[in-house]
Amino acid sequence: MAKKVQAYVKLQVAAGMANPSPPVGPALGQQGVNIMEFCKAFNARTESLEKGLPIPVVITVYADRSFTFVTKTPPAAVLLKKALGLKSGSSKPNKDKVGTVTQAQLRQIAETKAADMTGATIETKMKSIAGTARSMGLIVEE
């Protein structure tokens, strides 16, 4: 018989840098999960990724206090900032533009995030990421 699910915990944790301090410790401690076991497993799974890149993770906690987790791809905004070498987006995206993103960069980010996004084709995923880029104050090349 399948294990009974007690809770789902959604977090964003830096790749290869999970430790028991907030936000990981309190979120998992409330559910009675072995925090160090999660940290070691998460760090092992994300060691191939760029250290410090925020990785969304969904942790499924079962009634017997065991857990499984699924890592997702980094948020589109983080990938856009990394691709353009920006520290942050614009505080006034409608007035101040902070950079320009090309169609090739959009396609690369859409392909990276393809597994975690809805949308039938890569073009629809590119449009979604272009919307994120515009909301950050980036100019999207046509």
Swiss-Prot record:
Query: Highest taxon of the source?
Result: Bacteria
The portions of this protein that span the membrane are none
Please describe what this protein does: Forms part of the ribosomal stalk which helps the ribosome interact with GTP-bound translation factors.
Q: Where are the annotated coiled coils located?
A: none
Example GO molecular function term?
A: structural constituent of ribosome
- A Pfam family the protein falls into: Ribosomal_L11_N
Protein's name according to its UniProt entry: Large ribosomal subunit protein uL11
Write the gene name: rplK
Show the CDD domains listed in the entry. Answer: Ribosomal_L11
Entry GO CC: cytosolic large ribosomal subunit
What does UniProt say on post-translational modification here? One or more lysine residues are methylated.
Q: Name one GO biological process term.
A: translation
Q: What InterPro entries does the database record attribute to this sequence? A: Ribosomal_uL11, Ribosomal_uL11_bac-typ, Ribosomal_uL11_C, Ribosomal_uL11_C_sf, Ribosomal_uL11_N, Ribosomal_uL11_N_sf
Subunit description:
Part of the ribosomal stalk of the 50S ribosomal subunit. Interacts with L10 and the large rRNA to form the base of the stalk. L10 forms an elongated spine to which L12 dimers bind in a sequential fashion forming a multimeric L10(L12)X complex.
Q: Which family does it belong to?
A: Belongs to the universal ribosomal protein uL11 family.
Q: Which keywords fit this entry according to its UniProt record?
A: Methylation, Ribonucleoprotein, Ribosomal protein, RNA-binding, rRNA-binding
- Gene3D superfamilies (UniProt xref): Ribosomal protein L11, C-terminal domain, Ribosomal protein L11/L12, N-terminal domain
State the PANTHER family in the record: 60S RIBOSOMAL PROTEIN L12, LARGE RIBOSOMAL SUBUNIT PROTEIN UL11M
